[in-house]
Amino acid sequence: MSRQKFERIKPHINIGTIGHVDHGKTTLTAAITMALSVTGNTKSKKYEEIDSSPEEKARGITINTAHVEYETKNRHYAHVDCPGHADYIKNMITGAAQMDGAILVISATDGPMPQTKEHILLAKQVGVPNLVVFLNKEDQIDDNELLELIELEIRETLNNYEFPGDEIPIITGSALLAIEALNKNPKIIKGENKWVDKILDLMDKIDSYIPTPIRDTDKDFLLAIEDVLSITGRGTVATGRIERGKIKVGETVELIGLKNIKSTTITGLEMFQKSLDEAIAGDNVGVLLRGIQKNEVERGMVIAKPGTIQPHIKFNSQVYILTKEEGGRHTPFFEGYKPQFYVRTTDVTGKIESFKSDDGTTVQMVMPGDKIKMIVELVQPIAIEKGMRFAIREGGKTVGAGVIINIID
């Protein structure tokens, strides 16, 4: 591998943009890379380079999660531009599960919209610990009082979903006007343009408000596979974020879930096209697997230290069923209901076998808004463990969120 080495000098943070469709998430991502490219080691990325999938071009809506890297004075960031459209919440669930914090982008002309709320709820469910808000399109509002009202509404919405709405930083600005200024003069520095300053101010707030996470480097290694590539002459590469532990080139690992357990050796590690000898929890990496064909491994499997996690199909869980207002079902459901269960990077159909209320009494039907214990049997075995969170989806919408209480089989 003649690639350049990845230098681990600054703390590494995984971050992303979330929010309603067309509120300016991808534009903001581009503005951040352009503004930071002036100050140091960041490569400027244009909107078109981030907004990369062909289906998306047709609709102007971000689908696949795009990974971008940038640096501030204090940190190295990997940024996921998260899909905004309801059909692609699936990617948000798998992309967001990788975030140490997120920038919630809200258009000042609309305020919080239904998808904004769905994304805040999902951020809570998949465990995004910290949010910072960018109130975009500020230039289109000429009334300061209106901006203040929108800010109040945002804080109230965040509080409703158990985020600290009163202390979360809200930065107003215009990502588009910042990009226009940077296109005219790519060398703009702080103090020369108010719109660019607002982007730099946002990054200062992210640096200070989103804490550097303590990585689980001393636990047993586990990576949930997001994607699989075949590289001619080199073999099969699985990509994903290391959830816990660390891994070195040459170590033996197991591939678990969806198919029979397979053992393999790691022959290479890469991050942002640079090679690594060792990768640690929090890193988004490509892992080269010895002797594994592309058809033997797929998204949703995990790569783990041998003997540390098993595939299972049946578990008991505590679940919250979303109300109609939260974007959930309008009607109750019964035993035998078969929705999709989203766990880590995988979605598997599961059959709900039985329900119990919190006091242990058996329940015949479940209403939107109920908190319930339920036993689930999946159609395929996946690597799961006690304490793991999951989302329940059906027909393009999130209908519930849960946590595994114990494994049955």
Swiss-Prot record:
GO molecular function: GTP binding; GTPase activity; translation elongation factor activity
Binding positions for Mg(2+) per the UniProt entry: T26
Domain of life: Eukaryota
Region called G4, residue ranges: 136-139
Binding-site positions, GTP: 19-26, 81-85, 136-139
Main subcellular localisation: plastid
UniProt EC number: 3.6.5.3
GO biological process terms on file: mitochondrial translational elongation
Keywords: Elongation factor, GTP-binding, Hydrolase, Magnesium, Metal-binding, Nucleotide-binding, Plastid, Protein biosynthesis
G5: annotated segments: 174-176
Matches recorded under InterPro entries: EF-Tu_GTP-bd, EF-Tu_GTPase, EFTu-like_2, EFTU_2, G_TR_CS, P-loop_NTPase, Small_GTP-bd, T_Tr_GTP-bd_dom
Residue ranges of domain tr-type G in the record: 10-214
Compartments where found: Plastid
G1: annotated span: 19-26
Region (G2): 60-64
Reaction catalyzed: GTP + H2O = GDP + phosphate + H(+)
EC main group: hydrolase
GO cellular component, one term: plastid
SUPFAM superfamilies per UniProt: EF-Tu/eEF-1alpha/eIF2-gamma C-terminal domain (SSF50465), P-loop containing nucleoside triphosphate hydrolases (SSF52540), Translation proteins (SSF50447)
Stretches the record annotates as G3: 81-84
Keyword set includes Nucleotide-binding: yes
PROSITE patterns assigned to the protein according to its UniProt record, in alphabetical order: G_TR_1 (PS00301), G_TR_2 (PS51722)
HAMAP family associated with the record: EF_Tu_B
The protein's role, per its UniProt record: GTP hydrolase that promotes the GTP-dependent binding of aminoacyl-tRNA to the A-site of ribosomes during protein biosynthesis.
Family recorded in the similarity comment: Belongs to the TRAFAC class translation factor GTPase superfamily. Classic translation factor GTPase family. EF-Tu/EF-1A subfamily.
Protein name per its UniProtKB record: Elongation factor Tu, plastid
